[in-house]
Amino acid sequence: MMGFFLAVLAAFLFISPSWSAAASDQDNPIEIGHVSWSRDYQGALQASRHSGKPVFLFFQEVPGCLGCRTFGSQVLTHPLLVEAVEDEFIPVLVYNNRRTGMDAQLLNQYGEPSWNYQVIRFVDANERDLIPRRDRVWDIGSLAARMVAALKAADRSVPLYLSSLAVEYDTSHLQTAVFGMYCFWTGEYELGSIAGVVATEAGFYRGREVTLVTYHNDQLALKVLIGEAEDRQCARTVYLNDHSTAVQSRLKIKQFEPNEYQPAPASDQKKQLQQWLMDHRNLSLTMMQLTKLNSFLAGDPEAMLQWLSPRQLAQLGSR
């Protein structure tokens, strides 16, 4: 069941083809993504001391192997990740395949191997690691989670768009439940606002309207999710996989068969948000942002805007 839903989620994790890159540099070598990098290490330390922002110290091989190119093209091009690197940190690029100058000096100082896969260190103005070094951090979710940890270690506030990105891409903790109801528009609206819900999708199961809910099981227990659906009186039945059907609930608990589920047409998805999306069609949104905006637009527009990043908000204001 999880493989089926993660495939569906992956198809929607980032919506809309257009993004205003602001300070991002999209003419970079492929290995270093779209971040606007500094090569002035000492200047970065001074900027960190002045601002309190951590230094995002990126050791990378340029030109690099397939793994380095994949990291640059698939991770360091995500607009929200790029925004967080540029706005919440002082980004510095170190080439790990140069034998002289600042690059060689920093490789030696930090004990980093040359000609290696990418490594990111988060350091303060005194050149101390804010969190322990970790290798093999090669995906969006893992990097976003470490950025969150580094900001916390530096006693910096963590923007919601970044912490949400870490949750949304933490696929090892994403679970699903399917709620049968009289109206899947209501299901997306009601269930999408629950803390820990990552995504919703309107669909049909055995010909009946359902809402597919993807949630982060470290932030939201299944029994709490089902309890919320009960309290909001928006579901009659919950369809679960083999390992979850023992949950106690006033709702009917039934076994889920993935091959009998199909998504509703696009015209039925995120119904509360459709006109708003038409008015802001150039705005790029993750699936979690779409889910939250759909739930908060009608009843709490201020809460809705909290899910957007500063650059996204600036795009709204520039219409």
What residue spans do the PLM features occupy?
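Bacterial N-terminal signal peptides
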Residues: 4-17
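N-terminal leader/targeting and pre-domain segments
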Residues: 23-51, 149-156, 160-168
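Thiol-based oxidoreductase modules, predominantly thioredoxin-like and allied folds used
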Residues: 35-39, 60-61, 81-103, 201-207
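Short active-site neighborhood of thiol/selenol oxidoreductases, capturing the structured segment around
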Residues: 51-65, 91, 173-180
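Structural micro-motif
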Residues: 54, 106-122, 209, 235-236
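Typically the conserved alpha-helix immediately C-terminal to a functionally engaged Cys/Sec
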Residues: 67-84, 186-198
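Non-catalytic, surface beta->alpha helical segment in thiol-disulfide oxidoreductase systems
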Residues: 74, 114-156
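Flexible coil/turn and secondary-structure edge motifs
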Residues: 144-319
